[in-house]
Amino acid sequence: MSNNLYITATESKSGKSAVVLGMMQLLLRDVRKVAFFRPIINQASTDVRDHDINLILRHFGLDIAYEDTYAYSLQDARELINNGQHATLLDNILKKYKKLEDAYDFVLCEGTDFLGKDAAFEFELNADIAANLGCPVMVVANGQQKAARELIASTQLTIDLLDEKGLDVVTAVINRATVTEAEREEIIKSLECKVNCSNPLAVYVLPEESTLGKPTMNDVKKWLGAQVLYGHGRLDTLVDDYIIAAMQIGNFLDYVSQGCLVITPGDRSDIILSSLASRLSTAYPDISGLLLTGGLEPAANVHRLIEGWTGVPIPILSVKDHTYKTIQTLNELYGKIEPDNDRKINTALALFERHIDSSELGSRLINRKSSRITPKMFEFNLIEKAKRNRMRIVLPEGAEERILRAADILVRREVADIILLGDANTVGSRIGDLGLDMDGVQIVQPNLSPKFDEYVAAYHECRKKKGISMEQARDMMNDPTYFGTMMVHKGDADGMVSGAINTTAHTIRPAFEFIKTKPGVSIVSSVFLMCLKDRVLVFGDCAVNPNPTAEQLAEIAISASHTARIFGVDPRVAMLSYSTGSSGKGADVEKVIEATRIAKERAPELLLEGPLQYDAAIDMDVARTKLPGSTVAGQATVFIFPDLNTGNNTYKAVQRAAGAVAIGPVLQGLNKPVNDLSRGCTVADIVNTVAITAIQAQAEKGLI
């Protein structure tokens, strides 16, 4: 089931908070524990609570600390992005979101309010956040005073832009619409049939409900910081319009309209009394209240006259600012749904219930899980998965700066228990020079280890048939890579990561010698986890086997499918070639055909197809033409290349052209996990590879 939804507007004053209110009520009907999260709020000050968070928490009585319901203010978010810390922003938002996700069954997320001057910035920000949280999206469009065709075009453009960014738009709500019933049907049909999203779109049109967009006298009071002179019990009165009363009574009364707020200097007793009189007269419309400006109050005898009334019929407020400044400030006020305004809340909920099919929408959301995942989400999930059952990972290149910085991160984040190999004095000195805290990290100097002689004997026993003497075995165990691999072999470590300094051959040779391959597997191979903007694909073999045979290719495919499952990728395996189906001939194609046959024979439950060209494997439109009816073509997640030349070049091309994050190579087929780093690896690469190795170790132990 889906466990989240991101509601984003397309512009300001779309009535998004009313839709959020309705969605929360809908979710609480079917889901036991629902959290509310606004990644970005408008308030820069912590003294003032965000309006929508306050509304949802108070009305629904959600037991969530306010500090847990948001990550940044819009101002702070903008500063981080301007300082080149966009990744930090997304990482920290994801961490706060995950805290709620772990504790609740569903997280309802609300985007920014588009109250600033840079709508494009907010649109991009909301899209990035929704993508990195893995949320399906509800788009709320402002339909106020817009023609049907304009609404269709603008909403369609928004949906297409979000879809291009890899977002799963599940529903669009045209709110505050001022269209006819026929136009409403046109909007729904047009958007439903034109949408480019991968899943069907639910479209709803909610009519304008003027009372929700109008401020109350209480809103006016809060906005201006006004003092209430009279009518404390009538502050929920709606304000339809403003009128500045600076003329004589005879002229003023001609301008009185239903629901208007009369603004006048506080010493205009004539306007004050005539306003009160008009409210009591059936011949005049009902005004909403009086706002007295300039810090002036009515004369004492006027006060006495008003106080003599039994129940003052309207609220009377007083502000210190003069009339012109007051009206300027009021022009920026728009109506909000306050937690204590039951009338507005019930109006909003009733509107939502009348015009949105709650059963249909609830079913779409609760029974739906977005398959899209961003690189940051995948990396975050790697770390979290590794942390659940901490493994012991040995790093033979213990004095290398990148290794030490990665070890520091891994220990602080409790991703794995780290063992560093190397000269104890050298490693300790490097740690001190870098100012790192390595409490909890085990440093082992191979030749001084109490296990050294045991490891020498074990290696000699394993390799004596190859002519290795005891003295040669002792020399080998002085090599940290051999020593670390033996730690894994003997169960003193759960996995090893090396290669920041050493070559690939040096890293994996010891594993070939004595860890060896799993039963039924004759070949060690590798895959890259390719994190595209909206999904993770598995590419293999791109690093180890130059020209595998058909049988080896079949083994690589089966191993890659197991690796995919370990990392949460549902395997649909494409055996790649330069032709699709039976269209091509030649030795290379025949090898892939034979490999496909062998793989299907050995793993009949596996969704596997071949030969396929890359475009037919990844693009559904091409697949419909070249291989209609296939369960793999167009939706493959595991791509098996016929040789190293093709695989290595393709993964690098996709990495550069698509901006993909390539994690790997991840070795597969060994009895215990050993993984190789690129000599150009970054600290982040090392952290990810250790997490991957830890997860592989968990899988070997049956923990996942």
From Swiss-Prot:
InterPro entries: DRTGG, P-Actrans_bac, P-loop_NTPase, P_AcTrfase, P_AcTrfase_dom1, P_AcTrfase_dom2, Phos_Acetyltrans/Butyryltrans, PTA_PTB. SUPFAM superfamilies: HprK N-terminal domain-like, Isocitrate/Isopropylmalate dehydrogenase-like, P-loop containing nucleoside triphosphate hydrolases. It is an enzyme of class 2 (transferase). CDD domains: DTBS (cd03109). Keywords: Acyltransferase, Cytoplasm, Transferase. It is found in: Cytoplasm. One of its GO terms (biological process) is acetyl-CoA biosynthetic process. The N-terminal region seems to be important for proper quaternary structure. The C-terminal region contains the substrate-binding site. NCBIfam families: PRK05632.1 (NF004167), PRK09653.1 (NF007233), pta (TIGR00651). Involved in acetate metabolism. This is Phosphate acetyltransferase. It comes from Nitratidesulfovibrio vulgaris (strain ATCC 29579 / DSM 644 / CCUG 34227 / NCIMB 8303 / VKM B-1760 / Hildenborough).
